[in-house]
Curated annotation (Swiss-Prot):
Domain Lon N-terminal: 11-260
Family: Belongs to the peptidase S16 family.
Gene Ontology CC, one term: peroxisomal matrix
Organism: Emericella nidulans (strain FGSC A4 / ATCC 38163 / CBS 112.46 / NRRL 194 / M139)
Enzyme nomenclature, EC number: 3.4.21.53
Active site location: 822, 865
InterPro entries for the chain: AAA+_ATPase, ATPase_AAA_core, Lon_bac/euk-typ, Lon_lid, Lon_proteolytic, Lon_Prtase, Lon_prtase_N, Lon_prtase_N_sf
Catalytic activity: Hydrolysis of proteins in presence of ATP
Pfam family name, one: Lon_lid
Protein name per the record: Lon protease homolog 2, peroxisomal
Amino acid sequence: MGTNGGRPTKLSLVPLPKGSVLLPGATLRIPVSNRPDLANLLSSLLDRTNAIRRDANSITFGCVPLCSPYLSKDGQHVIDNGTVDEDKKEEFESLEAGQARKEDLYRYGTLGKVIGVQRRAYSEPHLLVQGVQRLTVRRVLRERPFFEAECILHDEKETPLNDRETAELFQQLRQLSRELLTLLRYTSLIPNTGGPRLSPLIARKFELIITKSDLAQAGRLADVMADIAESGLEDKLRVLAAFDVKTRLERVVDILNKQNQIIRGSVKFTTISTDNIPPASVLDISQIDPRIRDLLSRRGIPGASGTPPPGLGGRNNEADEKESNELDELQQRLKDAQLSPEAQKVADKEMRRLRKMMPVNQEYGVIRTYLENLADIPWTKVTEDKLGPETLKAARKQLDDDHYGLEKIKKRLLEYLAVLRLKQSTNQGLEQQISILTKELDNSGGDIEKDIPSLPESDRAAIESKLNALTSKRTVDKSPILLLVGPPGTGKTSLARSVATALGRKFHRISLGGVRDEAEIRGHRRTYVAAMPGVIVNGLKKVGVANPVFLLDEIDKIGGPNFQGDPSAAMLEVLDPEQNHTFVDHYINIPIDLSKVLFIATANSLDTIPAPLLDRMETIQLSGYTTVEKRHIAKRHLLPKQIRANGLSDGQVVLSDDVIDKTTTSYTRESGVRNLERELGSICRYKAVQFADATDSAKLESYNPVVTVDDLEEILGIERFDEEIAEKHGRPGVVTGLVAYSTGGQGSILFIEVADMPGSGRVQLTGKLGDVLKESVEVALTWVKAHSFELGLTSDPNEDIMKNRSLHVHCPSGAIPKDGPSAGLAHTIGLISLFSGKAVPPKLAMTGEVSLRGRVMPVGGIKEKLIGALRAGVTTVLLPHQNRKDVKDVPEEVSNGLEIIYVKHIWEAIRHIWPDAHWPGQHHMDFVESRL
């Protein structure tokens, strides 16, 4: 049927497939299969048509889309406030065009003209329909066997040529249309983009439509572009309902904007553009298949080779303008960073290269990343050290609050602070004098207007000489490089953080454990793909200042020489105070000043640290915590921390010193306090359960916060380590020695038992003894055999005390390995006690190495041994005379609770052990020597 420009007309209607919309000027393929209504409609239309005019082009009917539940009743507005009925959603999802009812039809449609039938191989036939003009469905007359309705056909309204807003919308539509076509063409060249594609022939056809369209045809162009763009059903229905040209232009412009943004989001774009690409659209040519790109380049397509097209200059669109602004920002960042002269020279050179380079160039990203790294390095920015009269006092308090003991490291750090403060005071005085002399030198030329005469040349030279002398006296702060060596869990890492807090500086931790590649320290050279600076430069970038505190954790576990280089050798320059002011990272390749960085390294052992690296660091030994120190640490730090961590409050868990000591000695054996903290956590959790039960049962008064020693077995289980206790009665051949555990921090007593039996002089050693300990038994036996006559053990100087006798030396706790020379004195006294039949006092313990001449030589672990002796009930201790200095480190309560006797020779020890006994050779003590 024909059009009537607004008068009601009876039309046959075809419901379009779900999601399809036919716009005027567009073409739509309607599947014929499973559409009985369409077959009945075509049959009826053909019967009505005269035989002479019977062809496909004469068949017209109304094409009405299915209505979306997301549109308002008038079809003009999208419902996006969440009020859409769920039943309507489900009904729409399951709706098919062949079973549509009149309620399912949209209010507006398009008069369609059949232009042909299409059928491809192995596919169902389709009816090709072209949109002619818009229509409004006024009233449905019947639904079966096909729809018929009373409709109003609408002619295209004239575009207001003098409306400025409409003209601007039309220009925007043309620009966005060109952009969409260009993006579709280029995305067709890129594999696996998943986006819409457009053949060159069809794209060329649409380009001609865009070019030839003028303002009078704005509505027609809007319909064409709305059909091309991939948009939602609701958007296209709103375009169909837009009879006003201006409204239609606004809606189509929104659709094109969304479509272009979606394509840009799926493909990486750069500043490459061509004459056919509008300024807002750019594409990364490198994404196109190389063979296609080469073909495009040979055919002369601009921009396909990766270079900007002639006349564009690469700086004529929004992306380029944004890129230019970013480069200006980078230039400002480099300026604000106050680079060193050498770094500034390199940065200026690279920035000039960058500005001349297209972003598509592979070097562009490399250079830009390099410059960004240069800008991030703190070349001159430092944390101001606020060193005043209260600095040392505040730093000492900070260190004491965070850590108990560790006096050596605290002393060294306070020394560094004091030196830093004195240097700062000296420099301030020099700066004042330099300022005065500089001012005098500036005024030495005189002032004619003020009638000030100039200084003689000799006076000027004197001022310059004095100024140079003062300048040379400026002190430069070179931070020390400290190495904290000690067992695990002794607070080395946390101490470094506490140092940073005390100094008021930023802190950064670098874990060197397991580092095998030299490039991790010094960075990769820029020639490598994805090269970046090493951990030192990255640390500076992270803290943002040139004088932080760097913790080099586990430096003893850094890798040695391998095919990737030597990481430990790379640390030589970093940790050398004479070289690290010109440290060169392979990536930056410019000297960086590390002299202001306070390096604190930690290690568990010195054995694996290369000698050249160890020589560059100031080593501070940290021994394990003693039981007394662990008690203080537990009371001040660990217990309050665990109480809070387990949801309790202060006072809800109370542990006495005896409970803490029992937990330390019977449930842990370590140098640090990590396991002690775990055990205290178990106690707190046990009390937390009791407190929760009391609270839930409203019997809070029954809760007892005190933990006793008897409760520990129920809370922590059976004791894991047995503590040796001094015996009450002495017996010949049994001596109490002293031992310091290899884990560090703890000591105890060790019984040495010697027994004899008939035999051939053989000596049997048991108790899992090490080689050094076995040798000390041999030395002790040799000395006793050599001096048996002086000791009154034999009646004849030539008699062998071991004749017809064998010995067995045993150290209890046979499962625990034992080694070291410190039991030499105890072995000697044990042999003398056995052979003489005199018992050693049970409350007396001893330690010391013995030489063949009978000298008692110094040993280690004195502090731990004395604490263990006091805890075991020992009252008197024999120590080597040369260990007198080590007793100064012993806590006062320990030294006051023990009688410490220093001996130089075995004869001295014998005299103190058995003061009432008479030894035949005692008068020879000062000059007796070996008979060997």
